[in-house]
């Protein structure tokens, strides 16, 4: 009885102690997978669209998704090209040299990847052409030529809607724009001064005679006078306006301050006579001190 009873107990003791050792390796990967912290995702399109590789890989330690997450987490975020260069001239060189190549070949990451946003006229502009010194293999720190140099001052190709909608303040043609005066034409540019009419001596003589007869020439008379002098009615009207202003100024200069004082005194006397209803008998000298 003792030998039969002691043998199973000695055989069962190592069995109970070895049972947990056999189960731990099976449950350890599951527990580690359950409590494994999720990898940080980046802000790139690949990391946002990619699926989580931890759930799909099972107990195999992750799959292709884990590699995508690791690559997305270690990938450098998008930043402007100018921030990668410490010197301003280097940033300008990188912009001028890298923009046309990236836009033409479609290489690199762009915020506006649509092909409809690229204007062919702008890409063919000489200011955006790639300099031979800025091609692949050259140093990006070499400063380029000036963007607004003398060679880039050619007139731009104006679109029809610019010429039609009077965007520049007045209607003009693209051929009228000078080579070096393109920046002077803008919506806030001053209008050119009106050209003064140069009258001939015979025209001035006839205009002066017409002004002596009548200071105001209107209607058919002005039309007839303009036709006889080979002038427009507007030119004749403006000349008469200026001539009347000159006539009034000359008359005031000839009369002087004494005539103005007499006018003021006679004006007060006329108001007094109208108020008292007295007839105009004698002229009162308003300049005397008596």
Swiss-Prot record:
GO terms for cellular component: chromatin; chromosome; cytoplasm; nucleolus; nucleus. Pfam families: Homeodomain. It is found in: Nucleus; Cytoplasm. GO terms for molecular function: DNA-binding transcription factor activity, RNA polymerase II-specific; RNA polymerase II cis-regulatory region sequence-specific DNA binding; sequence-specific double-stranded DNA binding. GO terms for biological process: brain development; brain morphogenesis; central nervous system development; cerebral cortex neuron differentiation; cerebral cortex regionalization; homeostasis of number of cells; in utero embryonic development; neuroepithelial cell differentiation. Residues 192-251 bind DNA. Belongs to the EMX homeobox family. Residues 249-290 are annotated as: Disordered. Its main location: nucleus. Transcription factor, which in cooperation with EMX2, acts to generate the boundary between the roof and archipallium in the developing brain. May function in combinations with OTX1/2 to specify cell fates in the developing central nervous system. Residues 250-263 have a biased composition (Basic and acidic residues). The lineage of its organism: Eukaryota, Metazoa, Chordata, Craniata, Vertebrata. PANTHER family: HOMEOBOX PROTEIN EMX-RELATED, HOMEOBOX PROTEIN EMX1. Gene3D superfamilies: Homeodomain-like (1.10.10.60). It comes from Homo sapiens. Interacts with WRD11 (via the N-terminal and the central portion of the protein); the interaction associates EMX1 with GLI3. Keywords: Cytoplasm, Developmental protein, DNA-binding, Homeobox, Nucleus. Cerebral cortex. This is Homeobox protein EMX1. The gene is EMX1.
């Amino acid at each position: 009885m003792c030998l039969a009873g002691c043998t199973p107990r000695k055989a069962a003791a190592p069995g109970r102690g070895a049972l947990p050792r056999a189960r731990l390796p099976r449950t350890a990967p599951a527990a580690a997978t359950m409590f494994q912290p999720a990898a940080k995702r980046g802000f790139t399109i690949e990391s946002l669209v990619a699926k989580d590789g931890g759930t799909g890989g099972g107990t195999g330690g992750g799959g292709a998704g884990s590699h995508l997450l690791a690559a997305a987490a270690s990938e450098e975020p998008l930043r402007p090209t100018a921030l990668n260069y410490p010197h301003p001239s280097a940033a300008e060189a990188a912009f001028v040299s890298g923009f046309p190549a990236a836009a033409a070949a479609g290489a690199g990451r762009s915020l506006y990847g649509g092909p409809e946003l690229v204007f062919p006229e702008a890409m063919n502009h000489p200011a955006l052409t790639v300099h031979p010194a800025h091609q692949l293999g050259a140093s990006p720190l070499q400063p380029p030529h000036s963007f607004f140099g003398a060679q880039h001052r050619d007139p731009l190709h104006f679109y029809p809607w610019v010429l039609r909608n009077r965007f520049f303040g007045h209607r003009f043609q693209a051929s009228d724009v000078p080579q070096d005066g393109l920046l002077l034409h803008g919506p806030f540019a001053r209008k050119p001064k009106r050209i003064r009419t140069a009258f001939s001596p015979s025209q001035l003589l006839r205009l002066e005679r017409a002004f002596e007869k009548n200071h105001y020439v209107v209607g058919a008379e002005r039309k007839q006078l303009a036709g006889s002098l080979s002038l427009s009615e507007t030119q004749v009207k403006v000349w008469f306006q200026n001539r009347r202003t000159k006539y009034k100024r000359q008359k005031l200069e000839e009369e002087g301050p004494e005539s103005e004082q007499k006018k003021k005194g006679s004006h007060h006397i006329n108001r007094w006579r109208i108020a008292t209803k007295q007839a105009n008998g004698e002229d009162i000298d308003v300049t005397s001190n008596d």
